[in-house]
Amino acid sequence: MLTRLKVSNFKNLVDVDLYLGPFTCVVGPNGVGKSNLFDAIRFLSALANHTLMEAAAAVRDQDSRTAHVRDLFHRVGDHYAERITFEAEMIVPRRAIDDLGQEAEASITFLRYSLELAYRETADSLMQGNLAIVKEELVHITHGAAPRHLLFPHSAGDWRGSAMYGKRRAPYFISTTGEGENRVIRLHQDGGSRGQPLSRSAANLPRTVLSNANAAESPTVLVARREMESWQMLQLEPSALRKPDEFSASTRLEADGRHLAATLYRLGRHDGQQVRTVEGSESESQGQAITSQQLRDLASQLELTTQNAARVYSQIANRLAELIDDVHEIKIDRDEKRELLTLHVKNEEGTFHPARALSDGTLRFLALAVLESDPQMQGVICLEEPENGIHPARIPAILQLLRDIAVDTQEPVGEDNPLRQVIVNTHSPSVFQQVPDDSVVFVKTREAIDEEGRLCKKAHFLCLSDTWRAKVSEDAARGDLLPYLNPVLPKNYIEVSKQKRVVDREDMQQLLLSFSG
């Protein structure tokens, strides 16, 4: 869970210091930096598992073939900022698995990761430059300091007591010493002063030290790495949601919606385990006859799995029915011949329709409902403009679903309340008016003077007054919020057409008056 993010000189994010809660709605007009905030989160996530240049490529302008790594740096005219800095405070899970399948347990779960990057020219003028690490640090935040860092409402005993775990005396898990060519990044062992740190020259590091962590050398760093890897941008594609899955497919819902059927099938299996078939039991017995007890055990397992599947599918169908009228049942069809799993939804007429025949909106709702039910889905989930493709009357329902996906900070963290966070952005008045007021972060551009004395524009993040965010953030002006409360301007405000607008109709005006009255 990302609780605070500081960014400077990344695109138009300059001196940004943003506190985050379990659910955050970033509101603002186009072009002010809402997407850049998501890009910063995606960039940090990519850096946890890829090289510096691969991570940069993941967030550069996808529409431009000539996009340059330097475009990530804040620019004023022809001048680029020299360095990009990030600082992320996060609560991480207790345990994680490394690339070799080894389990690691964090010695403490409230951490701060800092990273400073510079642009480095190459000797070959035909090649673009590279990114270089100036500083990389990972430190812990103590239990005593937690109330000063976790500003959103939460239960100190139930939620914070379960989310924050462990202790540590030594300050650093990763530290940086020296300057220039002598700069060294040290990976400290979880034993603190008792273990010797592993030192690496920062001069030519192709990736962050955190991205190379494993369970044996640095379990806490590995857990932080896995947490950052889980930060994702959810971009559900109807074509991906409609595809059936092979039996061998991943059972984790991807950011584009792939493996929806396989994920739902996993949730329906008892204890997450695949049902053993009679044929499988025979092969394990190396041709020996199956005993009556084995058959009874297998029948019992099959019955439990069937009951669990019915319960899970019913829960998700009921959730979906709150959002869409024509959904009464869901199931996964298992095609043994083609070895495919296909999602089906039954309508009020009793007809089952495969995923390929479902509407985009239904599939999107279904994916979010599955995500809500999946305890394995943790970390940060970013979603742009959740209102897109949704009927206006359904917007409150999808907003409630997104809020329910996020962790409940009044209850202990556990399988039924995973450490999960949702951040959405929007410029829709319908969304702005219906989210909790303390979840709103308003973005606008503001003129400022950079370090060299040049006039520039940067993203400025504001909040609504009398919310927990007001402790650390400036209040948004009422004039900036007015368009989101009255999305249609008065008739005489600007002459756009001589035709009568819908809002100008007398019956519409009466309807508006009845709501406002």
Describe the predicted segments one by one.
Residues I97-S300, L304-T305:
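Electropositive, glycine-dotted interaction segments
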Residues D39-F110, E116-T122:
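Conserved P-loop NTP-binding catalytic core
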Residues M1-V14:
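N-terminal pre-Walker A segment at the start of P-loop NTPase domains
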Residues P22-D63, L363-L371, L401, N425-P429:
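Phosphate-binding glycine-rich loops of NTP-binding sites
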Residues P29, I290-Q293, R311-S373, L383-I395:
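Conserved ABC ATPase signature
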